């Protein structure tokens, strides 16, 4: 009460009191108008259309076999051939009777689907047998080698691996422990990969 008996008008404090009596504080950064996301411009739609326009079917007969004389490979799907599948590589490999390839190892894992024939692999000294219709897994970093066990038939496999993804992650290590044979298997000097694949 004032000296004259009237009620006092509330006055604002110059310094806020404790707890809930403190005035609301406004952060200076919220007081400024800012643009946090600017308009985006680019060629993404062109890239997307380019991917949609890429071929979806690849004919194996359009590509050449490489290697020899005991085994041959044919790269099919990889980032150099198509922009659609940038993280996977797929190729065929055919082994002549009693043929084998080099002993090697790489960082990426691989899946082999055996299309024809039968054979075995050696993974870090362990033997794994397989036949047509089987899938073989080659784990990351395993030193391995593939062998056709037939005396007179070829062995054909489809190999799938995420090698491009591993290369992107800079997991580059790949080495050969032995070179591929440069002489044909005796009695199978005329072995050639299939022309219809």
Per-range role (PLM):
Residues 101-104, 121-122, 138, 144-151:
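Short beta-strand His + acidic residue motifs that chelate non-heme Fe in jelly-roll/DSBH
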Residues 125-141:
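Short acidic-glycine-tyrosine-enriched beta hairpin
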């Amino acid at each position: 009460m004032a000296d004259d008996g009237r009620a006092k008008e509330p006055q604002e404090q110059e310094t806020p009191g404790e707890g809930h009596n403190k005035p609301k504080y406004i952060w200076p950064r919220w007081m400024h108008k800012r643009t946090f996301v600017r308009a985006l411009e680019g060629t993404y739609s062109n890239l997307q259309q380019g991917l949609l326009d890429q071929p979806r079917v690849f004919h194996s007969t359009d590509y050449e076999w490489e290697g020899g004389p005991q085994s041959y490979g044919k790269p099919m799907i990889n980032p150099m051939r198509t922009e659609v599948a940038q993280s996977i590589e797929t190729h065929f490999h055919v082994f002549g009777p009693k043929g084998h390839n080099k002993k090697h190892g790489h960082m990426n894992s691989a899946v082999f689907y055996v299309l024809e024939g039968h054979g075995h692999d050696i993974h870090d000294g362990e033997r794994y047998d397989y036949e047509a219709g089987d899938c073989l897994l080659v784990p990351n970093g395993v030193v391995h080698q593939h062998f056709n066990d037939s005396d007179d038939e070829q062995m054909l496999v489809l190999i799938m691996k995420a090698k491009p993804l591993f290369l992107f992650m800079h997991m580059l290590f790949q080495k050969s422990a032995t070179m591929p044979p440069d002489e044909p298997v005796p009695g199978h000097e005329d072995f050639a990969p299939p022309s219809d694949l």
